Amino acid sequence: MIISAASDYRAAAQRILPPFLFHYMDGGAYSEYTLRRNVEDLSEVALRQRILKNMSDLSLETTLFNEKLSMPVALGPVGLCGMYARRGEVQAAKAADAHGIPFTLSTVSVCPIEEVAPAIKRPMWFQLYVLRDRGFMRNALERAKAAGCSTLVFTVDMPTPGARYRDAHSGMSGPNAAMRRYLQAVTHPQWAWDVGLNGRPHDLGNISAYLGKPTGLEDYIGWLANNFDPSISWKDLEWIRDFWDGPMVIKGILDPEDARDAVRFGADGIVVSNHGGRQLDGVLSSACALPAIADAVKGDIAILADSGIRNGLDVVRMIALGADTVLLGRAFLYALATAGQAGVANLLNLIEKEMKVAMTLTGAKSISEITQDSLVQVLGKELPAALAPMAKGNAA
């Protein structure tokens, strides 16, 4: 298959992966309305084309938390990467490192902190959930600090897991799930050889290191379900702010007031995110939520965004809507499942090229020049309500 665009990786990954793994990453919560809106709303954001601007000196470089980034993109935290490619977290981290952008290791990664951190030169970021087991949280934070992780991404939009109906149909959960997964694995030989046989161990490395025993997929599902903490509040995060002396980012913000609370709390950054449409179906897409949040806290805190970003044009759109940097999720996982480190490296090259084209044709020579003024109204059609104020006066 010829890969000429980031979207090609999704089709390739679907052919390679057992259905339980493909649909686990591809699916969303309930009827997947928000999952679809994430992509559709972003696609409706029209950019303002400008000409004759002498774009010979164009730069994608930016700085975030005193780190230089080759472009305003980071690989976000995605669980179970090591089930999508052989030691997948290591491969993805190496691709990000080579491109000059951060990699974020998930709490529920296959490869533990101690395996991924030494594989790259750049300090990685570490993502942590709010869990009932505070001992695990402290253990993970201590290990992340010892490994030199620079930034903590604290996910707060999972006090309880979302209802993901696709998982029951595909075999990730539901009746006879283990047998269904086995039958799918043996009928997908490329994955079975690369990951099933040669990608072992398949336990959840960070959890296993804490529990002192291997933690497989069934253990992971049970342990995680029992450890989400619906009682969490801002006060419960104070000990983490005191313990972690590096940048701390709160992930899962969709409301301006929550963004203001993050500023008051002392966070260094927020991620405008609905968890890729995997938590509460029917909430705002990130593209719709972002402008109001940017109006509320831009300049007071770093604003990152994810959910629905599939290519370099989407990155430029998110920056124009108010983000400082974006996180990739499904987009890089599709590429990882298709071609490992080389796939992620190629995806990042594609995104960089697409960003350069978009910036050249909108007259933005640097990331700081991608602003609300880069946006226009979609031809003859109102933008989604949350975006409409930004287009005022710029109708094409």
Curated annotation (Swiss-Prot):
InterPro entries: Aldolase_TIM (IPR013785), Alpha-hydoxy_acid_DH_FMN (IPR012133), FMN-dep_DH (IPR000262), FMN_HAD (IPR037396), FMN_hydac_DH_AS (IPR008259), LldD (IPR020920)
Alphabetic keyword roster: Cell inner membrane, Cell membrane, Flavoprotein, FMN, Membrane, Oxidoreductase
Location of the FMN hydroxy acid dehydrogenase domain: 1-380
UniProt superkingdom: Bacteria
Entry-linked Pfam families: FMN_dh
Enzyme Commission code(s) on record: 1.1.-.-
Molecular function terms, GO-annotated: FMN binding; L-lactate dehydrogenase activity
SUPFAM superfamilies: FMN-linked oxidoreductases (SSF51395)
Principal location listed in the UniProt entry: membrane
Subcellular location: Cell inner membrane
Annotated residues for binding of FMN: 106, 127, 155, 251, 306-330
Task of the protein: Catalyzes the conversion of L-lactate to pyruvate. Is coupled to the respiratory chain.
Protein name, entry field: L-lactate dehydrogenase
